Regions:
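Active-site-proximal specificity loops/subdomain of glycosyltransferases
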Residues: 1-42
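Conserved glycosyltransferase catalytic-site signature
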Residues: 30-35, 55, 145-150
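GT-A fold catalytic core of metal-dependent nucleotide-sugar glycosyltransferases
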Residues: 33-76
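A general structural signal for short secondary-structure junctions and capping/turn motifs
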Residues: 39-43, 50, 142-144, 192-195
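Short, solvent-exposed loop/turn segments at secondary-structure junctions
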Residues: 55-59, 63-65, 82-83, 157-159, ...
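Conserved catalytic core of nucleotide-sugar-dependent glycosyltransferases
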Residues: 59-139
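Catalytic core and acceptor-binding pocket of nucleotide-sugar-dependent glycosyltransferases
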Residues: 102-191
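Extended C-terminal regions of large enzymes
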Residues: 193-204
Protein backbone atom coordinates (compact mmCIF):
# COMPACT_ATOMS: atom_id res chain seq x y z
CA UNK A 1 0.00 0.00 0.00
CA UNK A 2 2.91 2.34 0.63
CA UNK A 3 3.47 2.63 -3.12
CA UNK A 4 0.32 4.73 -3.59
CA UNK A 5 0.33 6.67 -0.33
CA UNK A 6 1.94 10.09 0.19
CA UNK A 7 5.38 10.01 1.79
CA UNK A 8 4.13 11.59 5.00
CA UNK A 9 2.13 8.44 5.78
CA UNK A 10 4.13 5.36 6.74
CA UNK A 11 3.80 2.11 8.65
CA UNK A 12 4.25 2.33 12.41
CA UNK A 13 5.79 -0.99 13.56
CA UNK A 14 5.21 -0.10 17.18
CA UNK A 15 1.46 0.44 16.56
CA UNK A 16 -0.15 -2.70 15.14
CA UNK A 17 -3.43 -1.09 14.06
CA UNK A 18 -2.25 2.41 13.14
CA UNK A 19 -0.11 4.17 10.56
CA UNK A 20 2.22 7.02 11.45
CA UNK A 21 1.68 10.44 9.91
CA UNK A 22 3.91 13.52 9.85
CA UNK A 23 0.90 15.82 9.38
CA UNK A 24 -1.93 14.27 11.40
CA UNK A 25 -2.51 12.03 14.42
CA UNK A 26 -1.97 8.28 13.79
CA UNK A 27 -4.29 6.86 11.13
CA UNK A 28 -6.17 3.59 11.58
CA UNK A 29 -5.80 0.67 9.17
CA UNK A 30 -9.45 1.00 8.21
CA UNK A 31 -9.08 4.62 7.14
CA UNK A 32 -5.86 3.81 5.24
CA UNK A 33 -7.67 1.09 3.28
CA UNK A 34 -10.26 3.66 2.25
CA UNK A 35 -7.59 6.18 1.21
CA UNK A 36 -5.93 3.53 -0.97
CA UNK A 37 -9.19 3.06 -2.91
CA UNK A 38 -9.35 6.79 -3.61
CA UNK A 39 -5.67 6.73 -4.61
CA UNK A 40 -6.10 3.75 -6.95
CA UNK A 41 -6.60 5.96 -10.01
CA UNK A 42 -2.98 7.09 -9.60
CA UNK A 43 -1.81 3.56 -10.35
CA UNK A 44 -4.58 2.17 -12.59
CA UNK A 45 -5.62 3.48 -16.01
CA UNK A 46 -8.99 1.72 -16.25
CA UNK A 47 -12.13 3.86 -16.55
CA UNK A 48 -14.06 1.65 -14.11
CA UNK A 49 -12.74 0.34 -10.81
CA UNK A 50 -14.43 -2.54 -8.98
CA UNK A 51 -13.75 -2.94 -5.28
CA UNK A 52 -14.26 -6.47 -3.98
CA UNK A 53 -14.08 -7.19 -0.26
CA UNK A 54 -11.22 -9.59 0.51
CA UNK A 55 -13.62 -11.75 2.54
CA UNK A 56 -15.90 -12.37 -0.45
CA UNK A 57 -16.18 -15.91 -1.80
CA UNK A 58 -17.70 -16.20 -5.28
CA UNK A 59 -20.33 -18.91 -5.63
CA UNK A 60 -21.49 -18.11 -9.17
CA UNK A 61 -19.91 -16.75 -12.35
CA UNK A 62 -19.68 -12.97 -12.35
CA UNK A 63 -19.76 -10.98 -15.58
CA UNK A 64 -19.19 -7.32 -14.62
CA UNK A 65 -20.55 -5.98 -17.91
CA UNK A 66 -23.76 -7.94 -17.59
CA UNK A 67 -24.32 -7.16 -13.93
CA UNK A 68 -22.96 -3.63 -13.54
CA UNK A 69 -23.57 -1.86 -16.88
CA UNK A 70 -26.93 -0.67 -18.18
CA UNK A 71 -27.03 1.50 -21.31
CA UNK A 72 -23.48 2.73 -20.64
CA UNK A 73 -24.36 3.65 -17.05
CA UNK A 74 -22.58 2.00 -14.13
CA UNK A 75 -24.43 0.52 -11.16
CA UNK A 76 -24.19 2.59 -7.98
CA UNK A 77 -25.33 0.50 -5.02
CA UNK A 78 -27.99 2.51 -3.19
CA UNK A 79 -30.57 1.58 -0.59
CA UNK A 80 -32.48 3.69 1.91
CA UNK A 81 -31.46 2.77 5.42
CA UNK A 82 -31.07 4.54 8.73
CA UNK A 83 -28.48 3.50 11.30
CA UNK A 84 -26.34 5.57 13.69
CA UNK A 85 -23.14 4.75 11.81
CA UNK A 86 -24.68 5.70 8.46
CA UNK A 87 -25.91 9.00 9.88
CA UNK A 88 -22.38 9.78 11.06
CA UNK A 89 -20.84 8.82 7.72
CA UNK A 90 -23.40 10.90 5.82
CA UNK A 91 -22.64 13.92 8.00
CA UNK A 92 -18.88 13.56 7.55
CA UNK A 93 -19.38 13.27 3.79
CA UNK A 94 -21.51 16.43 3.84
CA UNK A 95 -18.75 18.28 5.69
CA UNK A 96 -16.07 17.22 3.20
CA UNK A 97 -18.30 18.04 0.23
CA UNK A 98 -19.70 21.32 1.55
CA UNK A 99 -23.27 19.97 1.54
CA UNK A 100 -26.06 20.49 4.09
CA UNK A 101 -25.84 17.77 6.73
CA UNK A 102 -29.48 16.76 6.30
CA UNK A 103 -29.39 16.32 2.54
CA UNK A 104 -29.04 12.78 1.26
CA UNK A 105 -31.05 11.49 4.21
CA UNK A 106 -31.18 7.69 4.62
CA UNK A 107 -28.84 6.96 1.71
CA UNK A 108 -26.58 3.91 2.06
CA UNK A 109 -23.94 3.18 -0.56
CA UNK A 110 -21.91 0.63 1.43
CA UNK A 111 -21.46 -2.86 0.00
CA UNK A 112 -18.97 -5.65 -0.59
CA UNK A 113 -18.75 -5.39 -4.39
CA UNK A 114 -18.78 -1.75 -5.46
CA UNK A 115 -17.96 -0.07 -8.78
CA UNK A 116 -16.75 3.50 -9.31
CA UNK A 117 -15.85 5.61 -12.32
CA UNK A 118 -12.30 6.91 -12.55
CA UNK A 119 -13.33 10.40 -13.66
CA UNK A 120 -15.65 10.72 -10.66
CA UNK A 121 -12.92 9.75 -8.21
CA UNK A 122 -10.65 12.45 -9.63
CA UNK A 123 -13.45 15.03 -9.56
CA UNK A 124 -14.35 14.04 -5.99
CA UNK A 125 -10.78 14.51 -4.78
CA UNK A 126 -10.55 17.93 -6.42
CA UNK A 127 -13.87 18.99 -4.93
CA UNK A 128 -12.82 17.96 -1.41
CA UNK A 129 -9.60 19.95 -1.79
CA UNK A 130 -11.53 23.06 -2.83
CA UNK A 131 -13.96 22.65 0.05
CA UNK A 132 -11.39 21.80 2.73
CA UNK A 133 -8.63 24.13 1.57
CA UNK A 134 -6.06 21.35 1.97
CA UNK A 135 -5.12 18.08 0.27
CA UNK A 136 -7.97 15.60 -0.01
CA UNK A 137 -5.90 12.98 1.80
CA UNK A 138 -5.28 15.22 4.79
CA UNK A 139 -8.95 16.22 4.90
CA UNK A 140 -10.05 12.58 4.67
CA UNK A 141 -7.75 11.12 7.35
CA UNK A 142 -8.74 13.85 9.80
CA UNK A 143 -11.85 11.74 10.47
CA UNK A 144 -11.61 8.52 12.45
CA UNK A 145 -15.12 7.43 11.45
CA UNK A 146 -15.72 7.87 7.73
CA UNK A 147 -16.96 5.87 4.74
CA UNK A 148 -15.39 6.23 1.31
CA UNK A 149 -18.46 4.62 -0.24
CA UNK A 150 -20.83 7.14 1.33
CA UNK A 151 -18.52 10.00 0.34
CA UNK A 152 -18.38 8.86 -3.30
CA UNK A 153 -22.11 8.15 -3.41
CA UNK A 154 -23.14 11.51 -2.01
CA UNK A 155 -20.73 13.29 -4.34
CA UNK A 156 -22.11 11.51 -7.40
CA UNK A 157 -25.77 11.92 -6.44
CA UNK A 158 -25.73 15.48 -5.13
CA UNK A 159 -23.12 17.32 -7.19
CA UNK A 160 -22.85 16.24 -10.83
CA UNK A 161 -25.97 14.10 -10.37
CA UNK A 162 -26.36 10.34 -10.75
CA UNK A 163 -27.03 10.26 -14.50
CA UNK A 164 -24.51 12.98 -15.34
CA UNK A 165 -21.86 11.04 -13.43
CA UNK A 166 -22.53 7.95 -15.53
CA UNK A 167 -24.34 5.93 -12.86
CA UNK A 168 -27.75 4.46 -12.12
CA UNK A 169 -29.08 3.43 -8.71
CA UNK A 170 -28.96 -0.32 -8.08
CA UNK A 171 -30.79 -1.56 -5.01
CA UNK A 172 -29.61 -5.15 -5.45
CA UNK A 173 -26.60 -6.37 -3.47
CA UNK A 174 -24.51 -8.84 -5.44
CA UNK A 175 -23.00 -10.24 -2.23
CA UNK A 176 -24.92 -12.05 0.51
CA UNK A 177 -23.29 -10.67 3.65
CA UNK A 178 -23.04 -12.26 7.07
CA UNK A 179 -22.87 -9.01 9.06
CA UNK A 180 -26.45 -9.26 10.31
CA UNK A 181 -26.77 -13.03 10.25
CA UNK A 182 -25.90 -15.25 13.23
CA UNK A 183 -23.34 -17.91 12.23
CA UNK A 184 -22.82 -19.74 15.53
CA UNK A 185 -24.43 -23.08 14.65
CA UNK A 186 -24.87 -25.36 11.65
CA UNK A 187 -28.52 -24.32 11.57
CA UNK A 188 -27.50 -20.66 11.39
CA UNK A 189 -25.11 -21.41 8.53
CA UNK A 190 -27.72 -23.43 6.63
CA UNK A 191 -30.24 -20.61 7.08
CA UNK A 192 -27.64 -18.11 5.81
CA UNK A 193 -27.12 -20.06 2.59
CA UNK A 194 -30.86 -20.63 2.15
CA UNK A 195 -31.31 -16.85 2.01
CA UNK A 196 -29.01 -16.34 -0.97
CA UNK A 197 -31.00 -14.83 -3.83
CA UNK A 198 -30.62 -15.99 -7.46
CA UNK A 199 -28.95 -12.71 -8.42
CA UNK A 200 -26.22 -12.84 -5.80
CA UNK A 201 -22.81 -14.04 -6.98
CA UNK A 202 -20.82 -14.16 -3.74
CA UNK A 203 -21.03 -14.56 0.01
CA UNK A 204 -19.12 -12.75 2.71
Amino acid sequence: MEAVLPTWIRRAPERKHDWASDLTPPITNGVIQQVVKLYAVNAIDEDILIFCDSDNAFIRPFDPRARLIREDKLALFYVEEDRPDLTLWRNVAALLLGLPAQSGARCNYVGNLIAWRRENIIALRRHVERTAGTSWVRAFVAHLLISEYVLYGRFVDELPGTQAAGHFHAAYDLVHGSWNNPMATETDIARFFDRITPGQVAVM
